[in-house]
Amino acid sequence: MKFDSTEKIDFYLPKVQSFINEVVMPVELDILKQDIPVDKRWEPHPEIEDLKKEARDRGLWNLFLPDSDYGAGLTNYEYAHLAEAMGRTHFASEAMNCSAPDTGNMEVLVRYGSKEQQDQWLKPLLNGEIRSAFGMTEPQVASSDATNMEATAELVDGQWVINGEKWWTSGAGDPRCKIIIFMCVTNPENERHQRHSMILIPMDTPGVEVKRMMHCLLYTSPSPRDDVIS
């Protein structure tokens, strides 16, 4: 397969590579060496926040979004070249506001969010003012098959009543996390691939609880996951 360059690849890729080599890599080892307790590893790190400021100053922000109204207007093919470069380091994607779960959540809000939802959640995510989480995996079922989800949402007197537990929920432990996109069953009588919905749940909603931080990779993962009950 032949991988041809494009004008946008030629413009952005050298800038991304320079940012990584000149700014990110020199501080990465120092950040990784810091003995941060596992339950504190989602908290904002001052050196990473400095990287974000530099990335914005260099025009390297929200590069993942193909919609030019919000991002750089790159195709998936063009962005893949930048993502490959970002993959050299733990922190480059976060520094450029291109890290999961925020990227996928922003894409959902761009495609399907109402104007009100975009104003409330998408804009602050694009600005790096808040973080988000995505709730899919559940303790009791093989969650790689989304049709197994057991969490439910039922409309009662005009309000959604949501019951369920998610774990390995990336992002939920970050104190800046203000919204979770929560996958749940809303139409249990439908065909099994048409039973589910994604519901936006503000993290300060009564009944939402981050139960515990999940441990993985001998406690060395720089980004632990969480067990969330709704």
Label every PLM stretch briefly.
Residues 1-99, 116-120, 124-127:
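Amphipathic, small/basic residue-rich leader segments at the start of a protein or domain
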Residues 96-116, 145:
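N-terminal glycine-rich flavin-associated loop
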Residues 129-136:
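A short, Trp-centered hydrophobic/proline-enriched beta-strand micro-motif
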Residues 140-149:
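Active-site-adjacent elements of ketosynthase-type condensing enzymes
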Residues 151-154:
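A structural signal for short hydrophobic beta-strand segments in well-ordered beta-sheet cores
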Residues 159, 163-209:
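A short core secondary-structure module
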Residues 206-221:
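Flexible, small-/acidic-enriched active-site or ligand-binding loops
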Residues 219-230:
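Single conserved hydrophobic/aromatic residue that forms the stacking wall/gate
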